[in-house]
Swiss-Prot record:
Catalyzes the sequential NAD-dependent oxidations of L-histidinol to L-histidinaldehyde and then to L-histidine. The keyword Lyase does not apply. Its EC number is 1.1.1.23. This is Histidinol dehydrogenase. Zn(2+) binds at Q267, H270, D369, H428. Belongs to the histidinol dehydrogenase family. GO terms for biological process: L-histidine biosynthetic process. It comes from Burkholderia lata (strain ATCC 17760 / DSM 23089 / LMG 22485 / NCIMB 9086 / R18194 / 383). GO terms for molecular function: histidinol dehydrogenase activity; NAD binding; zinc ion binding. Keywords: Amino-acid biosynthesis, Histidine biosynthesis, Metal-binding, NAD, Oxidoreductase, Zinc. It comes from the Bacteria. The lineage of its organism: Bacteria, Pseudomonadati, Pseudomonadota, Betaproteobacteria, Burkholderiales. SUPFAM superfamilies: ALDH-like.
């Protein structure tokens, strides 16, 4: 059965409205979920380990006697790594090495060092950069086990110099995923608790007798986890609340249509709300891609999910030229942007808003997901207009440094007191004036 995918044309009168309708997405808040999460968090804050243990045993069908019994020692992580098939272990180790190398380079290039300068009167001004003390990493369990996400969250935190990384991962029915545990070891995770859900987020945010309170929580999760992260924000930092996955492909019509179709599938297979869009100035090529979609879809294990995603939120869009495609891409601000063209660098220079930019026909988005090196935790839902991929900079903070000399206190005191009086804050003014020589 052929797929029915939305087709748009940028020259049509209603294109702007059609594009806005295509992109429109608002995460629905389920009142029952919100109420349940609020109750769980309050319970964890009040009763600590006892509440976390109760919810974990109930939701994951366990019979643990204590939270301490749910912590995995480092040798369990080593055992998981050693149990992997040689090819799986080699792939995981290679991915970890590449992700680490990229983030080590990022640390050097992205202003993650302290600095200061001295003014002529001896006043010293600067900035002190320090890593976070402790970070919590949430990792989904069960069927949705993503070792790549462990690497992408843990490694930049470790490279940044975070003092301790605490990972939580649910193990429904006691089933552990060796790839996830091996990734935790390779990523430098210090402690692993086999707990999940809103109760795990609460334990990380508030701390319990066994689970230490963290300064920031990162990592993906289901609707309960997302709700819990929203609610504890402010008590701790969070990375982001991610929406459905997205891919936007800009193609000049010179790439194999099968490649492009499979790239669209690569995001559509995540879930029914994922969004896959193709922009191309060649109408005949768009038809070839549509044909490739119909031919390839029956061979995909997740074809039902892919079909629902492409029919519900996907689109094939004909544009005037590649320059217009770039302008539309900047408006969409996608999570993943592929520029599959003969001159990808030329068009890439015109892109201002995208979570990750994949240049050239050989650069599939999936390579970035797993092993290229850059982080795969990316802004979604057009937030790439103002936010960035997860990186080393998310695990550091900056403090201003001010050391005023006796001479500087005269000059700055005069300015500060004048402004303070203007704001009606006499103590501010006097605090500066007391240090001035009259």
């Amino acid at each position: 059965m052929s797929i029915t995918i939305r087709k748009l044309d940028s020259t049509s009168a209603g294109f702007g409205a059609e594009l806005r309708a295509l992109l429109a997405f608002e995460a629905s808040e389920d009142a029952a979920i919100e109420q349940s999460v609020a109750q769980i968090l309050a319970d964890v804050k009040s009763r600590g380990d006892a509440a976390v243990l109760e919810y974990t045993n109930r939701f994951d069908r366990l019979s643990a006697s204590s939270i301490a019994a749910l912590e995995l020692p480092q040798d369990a992580l080593q055992t998981a790594l050693d149990s992997l098939a040689p090819k799986a272990r080699a792939a995981l180790e290679a991915a970890a090495a590449r992700v680490r190398a990229y983030h080590e380079k990022q640390k050097i290039e992205c202003g993650t060092h302290s600095w200061q300068y001295t003014e002529s009167d001896g006043t010293v001004l600067g900035q002190k950069v320090t890593p976070l003390d402790r970070v919590g990493l949430y990792v989904p369990g069960g069927k949705a086990a993503y070792p790549s996400s462990v690497l992408m969250n843990a490694i930049p935190a470790r490279v940044a110099g975070v003092g301790e990384i605490v990972m939580v991962v649910p193990t429904p029915d006691g089933v552990k995923n060796d790839l996830v545990l091996a990734a935790a070891l390779l990523g430098g995770v210090d402690r692993v608790f086999t707990i999940g859900g809103a109760q795990a987020v609460g334990a990380l945010a508030y701390g319990t007798a066994t689970v230490p309170a963290v300064d920031k929580i990162c990592g993906p999760g289901n609707a309960y986890v997302a709700s819990a992260k929203r609610r504890v924000f402010g008590t701790v930092g969070i990375d982001m609340i991610a929406g459905p996955s997205e891919i936007l492909v800009l193609c000049d019509g010179t790439t194999d249509p099968n490649w492009v179709a499979m790239d669209l599938f690569s995001q559509a297979e995540h879930d029914e709300l994922a969004q896959s869009i193709l922009l191309c100035p060649d109408g005949a090529f768009l038809e070839r891609v549509e044909k490739a979609i119909d031919e390839l879809l029956p061979s995909m294990p997740r074809q039902d999910v892919i079909r629902a995603s492409l029919e519900g939120r996907g689109a094939l869009i004909k544009v005037r030229d590649m320059a217009e495609a770039c302008r539309i891409a900047n408006d969409i601000a996608p999570e993943h942007l592929e520029i599959s063209a003969l001159e990808p660098q030329q068009w890439g220079q015109q892109i201002r808003h995208a979570g990750a930019i994949f240049l050239g026909r050989y650069t599939s988005e999936s390579l970035g997901d797993y092993c290229a090196g850059p982080n795969h935790v990316l802004p979604t839902s057009r937030t790439a207009r103002f936010s960035s991929p997860l990186g080393v900079y998310d695990f550091i903070k900056r403090s201003s440094l001010i050391e005023v000399s006796a001479e500087g206190a005269q000059t700055l005191g005069e300015i500060a007191s004048e402004l303070a009086y203007g704001e009606g804050l006499q103590a501010h003014a006097k605090s500066a004036e007391f240090r001035m020589k009259h």
